[in-house]
Amino acid sequence: MLKALIPFDGSDNALRAVDHLISLVQAREPMEVHLLHVREPIDSWEIRRVLTADEIAALQLSEGEDALQAARQRLEAAGISYTATILVGDVAQTIAPHATEIGCDKIIMGSSGA
């Protein structure tokens, strides 16, 4: 079975990528689906002054979960199971290594994000 990664930022283009994947799966191309949301690091002295590292990590996770909500809803409505991951880092430098790490055959993404 193919593995597909959808880097998802909540943009209209990212939603179109989810819709495209759904159409592929419904056309009988079974896939193991992985959603990925990458959060930019919070590296602000003002924030680090009032939040602990654990609080920043929890904030990143919460905001990542919120960002994935629309993709989750569409995949669940289509009956497609998936794995969701939230990572912190530079978006461009995080997607490809993550795809390699989990052994993805396809990366399905819009032409530009938010």
Regions found by a protein language model. Give the residues of each.
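Small/aliphatic-rich secondary-structure junction motif
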Residues: 1-51
